[in-house]
């Protein structure tokens, strides 16, 4: 099976070490462009752009990098409760058109109640998933060209529609990750690709089986992806030494403060990440070549595959054997590590190389809208 391999744009910061300003790197547009262009040239299929108050806005970052890349796809965040589903559908169609079909969308419900409250969203975990289901139903239908009336518990729209369709038909794919039962129910009903963070294979297999069963009950099939860091070197010894260097500046106080901050999250996935290491820097290899050191101070994806190229490839194939076809990787610093992954890992995998998009992105093939709502009459050519 050919694998889709994505990279990551570190809009929340980058550097050689975790938890310290030593070796930190300024993340400006020029640096993000370097990473995006490297990923484009090296054969990564796309890049995940993170979201949240610690990050630059994912939509603006993607829009700024479209003109300087050729094949790379951009996986940007949809935020139910933060934006209207109808407006989000228009934005999605525009990004897809301007990128010539290189837009992908990642549904993010949020897991930090404090940050969500700051953004004006005051729903609990269950209510957020209820609202996300309503959001996604509307978003999908509008993008697929339907006129939508919807009267939900959290969202109501009347006469929602899209005048300019996306390039990808019937619409761009929707990605989503979540570990709670409510999240799995949403994935089974609404998304094309279900993402998990890098838990040990047995735990990932259990989640995949649960989502598959739920999707089958609705007559659907769902693809699967995984989000992992990678520390790959020419030898296993070098890789493990690099892993230790990455956290060499962490002290107990920094780890304790980070874990206390992450503990307020109501995200089940974040709780599962934290349980892998328990805030303890001892015994961080939680499964063969799966290292939980990143999660000591980083929220979200907290595990890395560590080893030489053949070893990491073997672990990737273990996940692929579970049904995973998409791998979203990252590494510190992200520019250099994109080359290491491409040079040391890609030769040992069947990597699906992205194709050059066909030309044809345009805004209006028919002239200006009449009264902002009506297509102009077409004129036959004789």
Swiss-Prot record:
Catalytic activity: an alkanesulfonate + FMNH2 + O2 = an aldehyde + FMN + sulfite + H2O + 2 H(+)
InterPro entries: Alkanesulphonate_mOase_FMN-dep, Luciferase-like_dom, Luciferase-like_sf, SsuD_RutA_monooxygenase
Name of the top EC class for this enzyme: oxidoreductase
Molecular-function GO terms, alphabetical: alkanesulfonate monooxygenase activity
SUPFAM superfamilies in alphabetical order: Bacterial luciferase-like
EC annotation from Swiss-Prot or TrEMBL: 1.14.14.5
Entry coiled-coil feature ranges: none
Keyword field contains DNA damage: no
Top-rank taxon: Bacteria
Residue ranges crossing the lipid bilayer per the database entry: none
GO biological process terms, semicolon-separated: alkanesulfonate catabolic process
Entry keywords, A to Z: Flavoprotein, FMN, Monooxygenase, Oxidoreductase
Family: Belongs to the SsuD family.
Function field: Catalyzes the desulfonation of aliphatic sulfonates.
UniProt name for this protein: Alkanesulfonate monooxygenase
Organism: Pseudomonas putida (strain ATCC 47054 / DSM 6125 / CFBP 8728 / NCIMB 11950 / KT2440)
Phylogenetic placement of the source organism: Bacteria, Pseudomonadati, Pseudomonadota, Gammaproteobacteria, Pseudomonadales
């Amino acid at each position: 099976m050919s694998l889709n391999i994505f990279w990551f744009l570190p809009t929340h910061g980058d550097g050689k070490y975790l938890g310290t300003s030593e070796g930190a790197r300024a993340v400006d547009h020029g640096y993000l462009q370097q990473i995006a262009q490297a990923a484009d040239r090296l054969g990564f299929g796309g890049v995940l752009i993170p979201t949240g108050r610690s990050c630059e806005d994912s939509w603006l970052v993607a829009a700024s990098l479209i003109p300087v890349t050729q094949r790379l796809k951009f996986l940007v965040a949809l935020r139910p409760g933060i934006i209207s589903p109808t407006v989000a559908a228009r934005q999605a169609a525009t990004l897809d058109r301007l990128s010539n079909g290189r837009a992908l969308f990642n549904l993010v419900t949020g897991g930090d109640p404090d940050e969500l409250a700051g953004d004006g969203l005051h729903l609990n975990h269950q209510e957020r998933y209820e609202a996300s289901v309503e959001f996604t139903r509307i978003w999908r239908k509008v993008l697929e060209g339907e006129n939508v009336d919807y009267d939900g518990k959290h969202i109501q729209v009347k006469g929602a529609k899209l005048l300019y369709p996306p390039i990808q038909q019937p619409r761009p794919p929707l990605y989503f990750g979540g570990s709670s039962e409510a999240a799995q129910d949403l994935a089974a009903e609404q998304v094309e690709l279900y993402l998990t963070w890098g838990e040990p294979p047995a735990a990932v297999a259990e989640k995949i089986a649960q989502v598959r069963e739920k999707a089958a009950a609705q007559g659907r099939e769902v693809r699967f992806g995984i989000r992992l860091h990678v520390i790959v070197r020419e030898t296993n010894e070098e890789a493990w030494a690099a892993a230790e260097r990455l956290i060499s500046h962490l002290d107990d106080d920094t780890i304790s403060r980070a874990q206390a901050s992450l503990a307020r999250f109501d995200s089940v996935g974040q709780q599962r990440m934290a349980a892998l290491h328990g805030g303890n820097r001892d015994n961080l290899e939680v499964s063969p070549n799966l290292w939980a050191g990143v999660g000591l101070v980083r929220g979200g994806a907290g595990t890395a595959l560590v080893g030489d190229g053949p070893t990491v490839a073997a672990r990737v194939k273990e996940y692929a054997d579970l049904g995973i076809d998409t791998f979203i990787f990252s590494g510190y610093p992200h520019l250099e590590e994109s080359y290491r992954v491409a040079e040391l890992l890609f030769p040992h995998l069947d990597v699906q190389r992205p194709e050059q998009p066909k030309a044809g992105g345009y805004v209006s093939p028919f002239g200006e809208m009449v009264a902002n709502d009506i297509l102009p009459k077409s004129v036959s050519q004789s």
